[in-house]
Curated annotation (Swiss-Prot):
Places the protein is found: Cytoplasm, Cytoskeleton, Flagellum axoneme
The protein, known as: Dynein regulatory complex protein 11
UniProt keyword annotation of Zinc present: no
Record function comment: Component of the nexin-dynein regulatory complex (N-DRC), a key regulator of ciliary/flagellar motility which maintains the alignment and integrity of the distal axoneme and regulates microtubule sliding in motile axonemes.
Primary residence: cytoplasm
GO molecular function: ATP binding; ATP hydrolysis activity; microtubule severing ATPase activity
Subunit text: Component of the nexin-dynein regulatory complex (N-DRC).
Length: 822
């Protein structure tokens, strides 16, 4: 798209955001009791903000104007934070992590795909060089230490020599047997043909009948092919089948990607020009306007001295540097306005003195209204009220800046969308004024002292420094105490050396290149409908994917969002094996460029022994994680860290080493630290629930795929592995039959069936569902009993308990009321 098209999209999005910001205070200020109405309001705002975010993210990625991008980035971070705040409000209201918006999407006439939350591309673009440099260092350390990750991708099992000889012998005998069978088949066919020729003898064939038979066979074959072709064309026309070149990359897509690359190059060039212009324009302004600004400021301050002297009879006290100096007096005000403020302040002081005298004379009122106010407060507490937002002011400020500067700005001269020098001049003029003001304040303070000595004959009163010194001394002692508590165990070591040590010990590992979009799934289309009938639906895979984006990727990717948004320090992914928990952890690191630290009990076994060693390990890990943030600390099979009873086979590994330290680590993590602790578990019921839930702030239950997700999975995984989907392959049948099997099972089966030989034979022998079904029968699915055990465990978690009480609470309260009436 062109610059004009992206500008139009931006203007439309800003208008939609402005309208939404005007509506939000009206809806949220009034307290409400109706939970359904509250959720509908929150969900509607959530869906609309997601639409705005999708458009803004696209615009920010493709805009080449550097000054517009700064404003859009500010608004974009604000929208992201607001979405997270609304999500947090919905979780607190409905007491569940999963929400369904199918009815709202229907009302707003939106497709489910429009609710998909994208990951901003600037997360990786802005630190691409840093990530590449870090990857090179990591690869170099791994190569020097003899740990090659490329060999680890395809592990090879060692086989004894005798077994290897037997395998070769079996394969050779099988090959010879196949050749022998083929030779015997050819002999049999020769003998059969000879017998047939003897039986028929020298019978003269009827050429007319032979021609008719050939025609009949040919016409049948030709008509069958023609019918198949017509049926395929009809299915393509109806949209039931994809067109023949559907999976191939079209020329339009290639051209669009090329344009994107060119826009990125222009973006970088304009950004460099803008940074250079910031320096040059400021220097030019300093030379041209610096002297005039200084003289004007001095004249204003002198005029203020004289006016204050005329009004009050004495010269004013000059504001301190800490207060802001003369900037407080003349902040967006003329000299006349400053004089009016002085008069108004004097009048207010006189009024306040009179009021104080009246209050002293009046008797104190009795405290009769306390009970009534308490009852009112209780009623207000029962009503739901939206908590104040930390991101709305930033969004409103961005919208106001857009209206003031860009809404009606004529940019016909700026076809290339380069920086606007006039805007830079306005900005730098303010900076220059504040810098010169500091120098002027020093001069004018001295001038004011001289005036006071000359006119009023006042001298400076000496400041008593004794108390201040004592206070400073006390503060110093407090700092010393804090320093003792936060003692740096590795003060004599560099971050590079600690980084190298952690890599060599296997605690800092290389994340696999997996995008979150590779986590395939489908939407839950009947979530709201099922909840209306009091049936709790199982979340779909795309619901899980959205939670990973909101709780993991967005806060780690954006520092502005992480500082103000509801803080998520730890995340637990619980689910049966094969549902993609490990893949999601690696996807978080890939999408944000985060470091991956592996603190699994199996990985830290035998490393850094003893209490001091463990303390040193955790200190080194989190010191590097803070310095090179964002960082993800992964604890695989985290239930082992919180075992109820450690199995005898695992006692030597000390799996519970981190149990006491994890809560302490979480307390030390601040909003500035973009560090996320992620735990994965396939047996959460083996852990102590109380300590488990204390450590993990957000618990996400990753389910096995439903029918819709399995249907999409089979199609995409078969195509990715070189398979061709034809009418002979009934994907719907595959999806139904494989109920209970996970993504891991499906991937394993597809890779096993689609060998190089089978892919080559697809032209003559298309794929069928039977091939995949026979391969998957040897695997164990996730049975209903296992799924129920996960549901029962989740119901015992704090959020699960609250949800259960909220569902059953209404009926119990009614029963209590009836009992009281009787």
């Amino acid at each position: 798209m062109s610059n004009a098209m992206y500008n139009k999209m931006w203007h439309q999005t800003q208008e939609a955001l402005g309208a939404l910001l005007d509506k939000e205070p009206q809806k949220m200020i009034e307290p409400q009791r109706n939970q359904v109405f509250i959720f509908q309001t929150l969900a509607t705002f959530y869906v609309k903000y997601v639409q705005i975010f999708r458009n803004l993210e696209n615009v920010y990625d493709q805009f080449v104007h550097p000054q517009k991008r700064i404003l859009i980035r500010k608004v974009l971070d604000g929208v992201m934070g607001r979405i997270l705040e609304l999500k947090n409000e919905m979780v607190e209201l409905e007491l569940t992590e999963f929400h369904y918006f199918d009815d709202i999407l229907q009302d707003l006439k939106l497709a489910p795909q429009q609710l998909d939350i994208p990951i901003p591309k600037y997360f990786l673009k802005e630190k691409l060089e840093v990530i590449k440099g870090r990857e090179k260092i990591l690869a170099q350390i791994l190569a020097d230490s003899g740990i090659d990750t490329s060999d680890m991708k395809y592990p090879v099992k060692s086989i004894p020599f005798d077994e290897a000889v037997k395998l070769i012998q079996i394969a050779e005998r099988a090959r010879q047997g196949r050749l022998r069978a083929l030779f015997m088949k050819q002999i049999y066919l020769q003998e059969y043909r000879a017998k047939q020729s003897k039986m028929l003898g020298k019978k003269v064939t009827d050429t007319w009948a032979a021609a008719l038979r050939i025609q009949k066979v040919w016409r049948r074959f030709h008509q069958r092919k023609e019918t198949e072709k017509l049926r395929e064309e009809e299915m393509i026309f109806l949209g039931m089948n994809p067109p023949p070149l559907f999976n191939e990359v079209s020329a339009t897509v290639i051209q669009a990607e090329k344009v994107d690359r060119l826009r990125n190059e222009v973006q970088i060039k304009h950004e460099e020009d803008y940074r250079e212009a910031l320096v040059t324009i400021k220097n030019d302004l300093k030379l041209i306007e610096g002297v005039d600004i200084k003289e004007n400021l001095q004249d204003q301050i002198r005029h203020w001295f004289i006016e204050c002297r005329n009004l009050t009879g004495t010269f004013p006290d000059y504001p301190d540097v800490e207060e802001g100096g003369s900037a407080i007096i003349f902040s967006d005000k003329t000299i006349q306005q400053v004089i009016e403020d002085i008069i108004a302040n004097q009048e207010e002081e006189e009024k306040n003195k009179k009021k104080k005298k009246k209050k002293e004379k009046q008797p104190k009122k009795a405290k009769k209204q306390k009970k009534g106010t308490k009852e009112k407060n209780k009623e207000e507490d029962e009503k739901w009220k939206m908590s104040p937002s930390l991101f709305l002011p930033a969004m409103k400020e961005g919208c106001n800046a857009y209206k003031e500067i860009w809404m009606k700005k004529d940019e016909s001269w700026n076809f290339s969308q380069d920086y606007d020098p006039e805007l830079i001049k306005e900005e730098k003029r303010k900076e220059l004024q504040s810098e010169i003001r500091i120098q002027v304040d020093e001069l004018m303070r001295q001038e004011l002292k001289n005036l006071k000595l000359a006119v009023d004959r006042e001298r400076e009163r000496p400041v008593k420094a004794g108390k201040k010194k004592d206070k400073k001394g006390k503060k110093g002692k407090k700092k010393e105490k804090k320093a003792k508590k936060d003692k740096d165990l590795t003060a004599d070591r560099t971050i590079e050396s600690l980084y190298k040590e952690l890599v060599e010990e296997g605690l800092l590992i290389q994340a696999l290149k997996v995008n979150l979009s590779d986590y395939i799934g489908e939407y839950s289309y009947l979530g709201t409908t099922l909840r209306q009938v009091s049936i709790e639906p199982m979340p779909s895979l795309l619901d899980v994917r959205q939670l990973i984006t909101l709780y993991g990727i967005w806060p780690l990717g954006s520092a502005a969002v992480h500082e103000k948004a509801p803080l998520v320090k730890s995340l637990l992914l619980a689910g049966p094996s094969g549902v993609g928990k490990k893949m999601l952890v690696h996807a978080i690191c890939t999408e944000t460029g985060a470091n991956l630290f592996n603190l699994s009990s199996s990985n830290i076994a035998g490393k850094y022994p003893g209490k001091n060693g463990l303390q040193m390990m955790l200190h080194a890990v989190f010191k590097v994680a803070r310095q090179l943030q964002p960082s993800v600390v992964w604890i695989e099979d985290t239930e082992k860290t919180f075992y109820k009873k450690v199995p005898n086979a695992e006692k030597m590994n000390e799996p519970k080493r981190l149990k006491k330290h994890l809560p302490q680590i979480l307390k030390l993590l601040k909003p500035d630290d973009r560090i996320l602790i992620v735990g994965t578990t396939r047996r959460p019921f083996d852990a102590e629930l109380q300590s488990f839930c204390k450590v993990y702030q957000k618990i996400i239950l990753v389910p096995r795929p439903d029918y819709a997700s399995r249907y999409v999975l089979w199609k995409q995984i078969i195509e990715r592995n070189g398979g061709v989907l034809t009418s002979a392959l009934n994907v719907s049948c595959l999806a139904k039959v494989t109920d209970g099997f996970t993504q891991g099972h499906i991937v394993e089966v597809v890779k096993g069936v689609l060998t190089d030989q089978r892919i080559r034979r697809q032209i003559h022998k298309p794929l069928t569902a039977v091939e995949f079904i026979t391969a998957i029968t040897s695997m164990n699915p996730v049975y209903k009993e296992e799924e129920e055990s996960f549901k029962n465990w989740y119901a015992k978690t704090p959020l699960g308990k609250k949800r259960a009480l909220a569902i059953t609470g209404g009926s119990t309260e009614k029963a209590k009321d009836k009992g009281k009436r009787k």
